[in-house]
Amino acid sequence: MGPLKLNTANLSQIVAAGAGRVKVPTYRRGPALKEGIVHVGVGGFHRAHLAVYVDQLMQNHGVTDYAICGVGLQPFDSAMRDALSSQDNLYTVIERSAKGSFANVIGSINSYLFAPDDREAVIAKMAHPDTRIVSLTITESGYYYNENTHELQSEHPDIQFDLDPANEKTPRTTFGFLYAALARRHQQEEWFHHPSHARVFRPSPHPEVAQWITDKGAFPNAMVDRITPQTSPADKESLANTMGIEDSWPVVTEPFMQWVIEDQFSDGRPPFEKVGVQVVKDVHAVEEFEKHKLRLLNGSHSAIGYPGQMAGFNYVHEVLENPDFNKFVWQMMQEEVKPSLPEIPGVDIDQYCKTLMERFSNPTIMDQLPRICLNASGKIPQFIMPSIAEAIWVKGPLRRLCFVAAAWFRYINGVDDQGNTFTVDDPMREELQAKARAGGTKPSELLSITSLFGDDLRNDKRFMQEITNAMEDIARDGILKTLPKYID
């Protein structure tokens, strides 16, 4: 018998064919569930993270009023709409590790709305009384947030479009949809919650709505973590051949999963603690967890991704199989990033770093370097530059961090050390590449983009010397020959 198409009718057969390696939802779905969560951005990470936690609450704790309505805002989200609709909004999460592969069919996404087809339906769903949480998984650029000023990029054409009262019913951005729903809730004088930053609504064309959001909205900070590579055709084929499931768009991920969230909700929340979520009262605790994750995990991903792709590697684990890269990443974490991080009660930073290296080295999830390198202009200012800034402030070591920044500056040109071209997928690609061409092996042109780097870095002689040296060495000798200079 061939693989079974994933849908509600086939679940019992899928379990039988899975020989103990496949779990499926046994709770009632559809009208039996109340959709208390609207989630914008149903990609791989959401389906491997929040949707899994909610599925566990439904499966193991009888929660029925926080099913998820997924929302796609962009034209490319039609692919997810079609995949989910063809299989009753079910999908498979494949966990891979050295111990083997296990599959969980997830049923927590109960419906899906595609905004380009019906924007009003999305606004109405967000504003519906059953909706108690609106959550987001969007890229860094989708936040329209300036890391240097810590404000909304209010001059961006998309934001300007959404600020025009004439366009309230046809928003372009996530925040335009949220504002339209909040304004409707304001009219109804009902409470509303969404996890974002209240400050992004301050440019509102209706001050009374902005004040209502400030008074009655809740905006919990959160830290999320689970490595989730892009799904490949080989992943689909493997699922069909080994577990007998034909899934249009499964998710491959690691066993590790973490979520730390501030306990600040205006209209109730699910009992997240029951499924391992760390719910904390202190917003500063969340911020400290987030700083650890951004600078150690994401910063190390940057140290693997840009130099690794320039050196000709394809996957994260392949980079760390190189002894020089392995030492470099570990030493950068220990000597240049860790000293800037706050201590968190109950968290052993050294053990956290060791766990990260183990996770990065997992060969079974085949984590692609292009995924790591995507949208770097929204990542480097968060993942690498803050550690550099703090090292400058305390006169600490920073040469490895400068090597990573220099590798990205070379990466921007779209040519690796072997002369092979690749696509630089970044919303600022044209400006970045123009600056990179103008600057050559000097960093000044790229560092003049103050929206990414601010004004201070160019004035620090030590930083400028370190990054210039790294850029010149990489240009002359390539990544692999330069790397040993940065290892003790």
From Swiss-Prot:
Keyword Oxidoreductase found = yes
InterPro entries with a match to the protein in the record:
6-PGluconate_DH-like_C_sf (IPR008927), 6PGD_dom2 (IPR013328), Mannitol_DH (IPR000669), Mannitol_DH/Oxidoreductase (IPR050988), Mannitol_DH_C (IPR013118), Mannitol_DH_N (IPR013131), NAD(P)-bd_dom_sf (IPR036291)
Q: What are the entry keywords?
A: NAD, Oxidoreductase
The lineage's top-level taxon is Eukaryota
Q: What class of enzyme is it?
A: oxidoreductase
Question: EC number(s) per UniProt?
Answer: 1.1.1.67
Reaction(s) this enzyme catalyzes, per UniProt: D-mannitol + NAD(+) = D-fructose + NADH + H(+)
* Example GO molecular function: mannitol 2-dehydrogenase activity
Enumerate the Pfam families for this protein: Mannitol_dh, Mannitol_dh_C
Binding, NAD(+): I37, V38, H39, V40, G41, V42, G43, G44, F45, H46, R47, A48
* Function per UniProt: Catalyzes the NAD(H)-dependent interconversion of D-fructose and D-mannitol in the mannitol metabolic pathway.
Quaternary organization: Monomer.
> Which family, according to UniProt?
Belongs to the mannitol dehydrogenase family.
Official protein name in the record:
Mannitol 2-dehydrogenase
Organism, scientific name: Aspergillus niger (strain ATCC MYA-4892 / CBS 513.88 / FGSC A1513)
Taxonomy of the source species: Eukaryota, Fungi, Dikarya, Ascomycota, Pezizomycotina
